[in-house]
Amino acid sequence: MNEFDKRFGDCGRLLAIDKVPQPVEPGWPELCREAFDHAFNGLLLPPGFPMFAEEGAVYELAGGDELVGLLNPALLAAEASKYGLQVYADVELSESLSASGWTDFFIRGVNNGLAGFLIREPGRFAPADWARLVASVRGVRTDTRFLLWTPGSTPAQLMELRGAGFDGTFLSLPWWDERSPWLADEYARLDAVASVIVPVDANDAGEMLDANLPDFEQYMGRRLWTAAIAGNGVLVPQFVLHSRVSDEVKAVNQWLARRRSIKQPLVVLNGLLGPGTVVFRGGDGIVLNPDRLREATLDWRLVQSRLPTDSAVIDQAVSDNVDSLLPQAYCRFSVKALPFIKLKAISTAEKRRLGLGVMNAARIAIEAVRPQVEDGRFAVKTVVGTTLEITANIFMDGHERLGASVLWRAADESDWREVLMTHEGNDRWSASITLVRVGRHQFHIKAWHDRWESYRAAVIKKRDAGMDVAVDIEEGRLMLGDAVRIARRIHPGITSMLEGLIESGDGDLLLADSTAQAMRTIGFRAFETRCQHDYPIMAERRAAVFSTWYELFPRSESSVPGRHGTFVEVRRRLAAIKEMGFDVLYFPPIHPIGRTNRKGRNNSLTAGKDDVGSPYAIGSEDGGHDAVHPQLGTLDDFRQLLHATKEHGLEVALDFAIQCSPDHPWLKQHPNWFNWRPDGTLRYAENPPKRYEDIVNPEFYQDFELKPRASLWRALRDVVLFWIEQGVRIFRVDNPHTKPLPFWEWMLGEIHSRHPDVIFLSEAFTRPAMMYRLGKVGFSQSYTYFTWRNNKAELTSYLEELATAQVANFFRPNFFVNTPDINPYFLQNSGRSGFLIRAALAATLSGSWGMYSGFELCEAAALPGREEYLDSEKYELRQRNWSQSANIIPEITQLNRVRKSTPALWTHMGVRFHPAHDDHVLFFSKSTPQKDSVVLVGICLDPHASRRAWLDFPFWSWGLPDHATVHMEDALSGREFDLQGNSHQVEFTPESPYFIWRVRGLE
């Protein structure tokens, strides 16, 4: 929460006065009463209004001395305060006064009762001058507000104004086309400066608003509610009070007053090709139809899937009743938070299933149920809000008609929800469900012989062929009698209708659709069959599939070379990391480091007295896995860091490394947990070809008996629970493939049953089967072979493998471009261009990607002939100059910005590779399942040379002829252009080795 929010928790609801009424009495009190009645809490005087009553006041736009006495702002402010209103001046800075002169000017305004000022030209003074000016004025009145008119400001200008002391900024809503994603980008930049207020109109917005136009009410209602949802306050022009939307103005202000200020990002949830535009902030959203001619169909499932809020559901009163919007119409909605799903113990009776003999076997077959992992042995992974399609092959003997349904529930619920399946042909049935709670779910499929529909279809064929169906009709009457006996108590209304039909014997009515519907309602299901077991689903929060990781060593964050960094010093880096677009801040182990066999620089076996050692040699006299290294600070310092990261919109990921130094307290407390050699020494850890003399590993099973060491398993689980209690919700797990799979399945199950929102990243650079198995047992994400996939064929085949359904159901990639252990050969000799190439590949191909600090500075110095960093930070402190030349910070920031505004890039799925007539150029598209977001990416894999490559654009996949025209947007520059024809030559250079184009329209 910024300073504006802290001091003024209520939202800014400002009325922009176009002219102060004259005479002041009774005009001004009447205006104040009217503003109060419409729930405003502030009045903005028009530009040029005199701010002082005393003679000789210096204000060039005062409007004449004869008005000074009549328009005394002190009197106006005093009258306004009676109605709970504060008065602001709209100031256009003249060049005749210095910063100190304007300081005196503002102080005099405050002394005359003004609550604050709207500054139109902040560039008149340097940010430091503004900071001093604001501080001086607040020395007179602490709650003085300085609002900054920001429409038209560049990102660089806004960045300079951070910390200058302003309380409010203004979003460029009146200039927005109600489609482009730049509105959310601008909001993020403004919010970093001060709380965001949204003007409903602006004189220079190019709009001629006429309150008498027939569509004015709809237009202004749309604008008012968009402004209210998008910001922490609104600026409303005075003329609206006397228009047909005055009641809507009051409703908006009252809604804002109830909501109060919130510190939440603004997001545009749809792609450029969607029929409508969805703006969402906090728990509220608005759907706009910007088209002036066509209706917009609303896909509430799609909106649900894009919500940035985990475990929440859209208000059913809206989603169940509004399925389209007329041209230029809008629809508001809200979301309701739902509790996470926490498991309860399953009884032995529920687990026990008894098989049936062959003679009693199900007559109906249910096969090839999808999605599933190893026939339900492990949970399918999905993300809350995403629509999950469930399919199966369902059939029985003969040509009988069948029915089928999916039954599903959350693991902490007892009642099942049922969704009827649709027959797609060739015995394939399908249904879709949407999971909106974080946690474990389960589903199964039921199928039955639809006796009535089978009978009805056969008789209709006979009747239409002119055959005698009298006996058949009598058979139908008997079947209806059976149904009546079944349904008499449950469906009395339907029972009465069927009894009348039986009595009449009317064949046409008996075969009618209405009778078939009545029989379906009764549930007249013969040979009902259930699939063999329930299939588990794990619905995780969005960060499990879409996240951006930044790794740093807290001990290297000191501003003094050679001094050990602290958690407090890490906080200084948070703004810069968030500015680059990262949302997960990952720390290697932060625990005490052992002394025995401590490693020296560059993994030397001999450490000097000042060498800091490897953080993976965990444990000393200062504690073990539940302690922090004393030179980093205290546990309370760490909690404060967690709080600060949350304030910056970041999450901390901790390294969970099951590794101990010989000094770890566990060796004395639990010596039986470790592998002691006959000579009394310990066997140190190995991960061939690497050896870790400073680390020993606990043993998960007891010698000879091969029984789990339950006390060790519980202790490791409790370590994770301890850090969860501190506020950590993401863990990167070191080398999980060197620990038993049963342990991981047990421990991850224990954690997720209590805290289903916790995310685990597997750092297992090993064989594919083991990496995939770790995903199956519960890891949310995994490092991948991307680090070593460099050429076109390697990248194409690997992405196609990861995107197959059988892999995607349990394995999610996180593309790290480097790690403290891995300095890829490609980066060692590719220069700045190579870093741009790898960043672009990771950011566009994977929903989650990460980098280890120093990558943005193009660090590549390596140990000769090895894929390791020279002077590795694993063994020493590394202070860096973050502003050094040749960095790629702007490009990384740009890539992350594009990712967040392009839904097609939110996952590794939906990728298709297209012909590029150059083996060094990778060309691909990504699209959402709904095709509302389509992006084309070209990346040159050669970091040393410029290349011109012919690219074949996938017009055929969009149903377009080869000569068609596609309207595009360059996501990096914002430039829009038309692409005519499906083959084009594109140039790539080492300075600009990639492009990202978003499809805006197809012709």
Q: Where on the chain are the PLM-derived regions?
A:
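Substrate-binding cleft/loops of secretory-pathway carbohydrate-active enzymes
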Residues: T150-P181, S661-N672, W744, H752-S753, ...
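Active-site neighborhood of glycoside hydrolase catalytic domains
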Residues: S98-A156, W676, F704-M771
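Aromatic- and acidic-residue-enriched carbohydrate-binding clefts of CAZyme catalytic domains
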Residues: F8-A16, F49-L76, A80, S100, ...
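Carbohydrate-interacting/catalytic domains
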Residues: M1-P50, A74, E79, A131-L133, ...
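Acidic, His- and aromatic-enriched active-site or binding-groove loops in soluble protein domains
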Residues: P73, S100, T142-W149, D167-D177, ...
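Hydrophobic faces of well-ordered beta-strands that scaffold small-molecule active sites
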Residues: R13-I17, L43-L45, V87-A89, F117, ...
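Short, solvent-exposed turn/loop segments enriched in Gly/Ser/Thr/Pro and often Arg
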Residues: V20, L44-A53, V91-E95, R120-A126, ...
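Substrate-binding cleft of carbohydrate-active enzyme catalytic domains
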Residues: L31, A35-P47, D65-N112, I119, ...
